[in-house]
């Protein structure tokens, strides 16, 4: 009985968090906004993206960042070219080999992000990446809207 209740609570929390993320994306249409979505399971992230598509009436562009990436800005601009998607979801940060360098360079380039991107940028992070953001790039972390947790 307890596991059923916990499971139901978990589903409610996930749905609520997904709705919060969808609302944040909708409110940021046509302008840059950095959103952090924290989920420790990559499989769960995929399920959440499917659920998110049910809440959003717009096309979400997904970008899986390669493990060899050294800068987030260059990786995104190379992938998008001159395209300005309605929203961009970046996944795979947990697999980046030089994650510390990527986080520091993103912090240094944060003003360029807002100048170049006219869409909400959602970074999917896990607890470890979130801790690194706090320690290595507190300005970037503070610049982002509140972290939306999917636990």
Regions found by a protein language model. Name each.
Residues 103-115:
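Conserved catalytic/switch belt of AAA+ P-loop NTPases
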Residues 47-55, 106, 132-140:
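Short, aromatic/basic amphipathic alpha-helical patches
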């Amino acid at each position: 009985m307890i596991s059923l209740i916990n499971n139901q609570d978990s589903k409610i929390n996930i749905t609520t968090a997904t709705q919060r993320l969808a609302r944040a994306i909708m409110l940021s249409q046509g302008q840059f906004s950095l959103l952090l979505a924290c989920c420790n399971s990559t499989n769960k992230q995929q399920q959440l993206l499917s659920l998110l598509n049910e809440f959003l009436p717009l096309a979400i562009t997904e970008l899986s960042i390669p493990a060899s990436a050294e800068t987030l800005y260059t990786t995104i601009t190379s992938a998008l070219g001159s395209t300005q998607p309605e929203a961009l979801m970046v996944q795979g940060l947990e697999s980046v080999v030089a994650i510390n360098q990527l986080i520091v360079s993103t912090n240094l380039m944060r003003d360029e992000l807002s100048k170049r991107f006219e869409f909400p940028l959602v970074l999917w992070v896990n607890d470890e990446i979130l801790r690194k953001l706090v320690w290595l790039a507190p300005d970037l972390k503070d610049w982002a809207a509140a972290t939306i947790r999917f636990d």
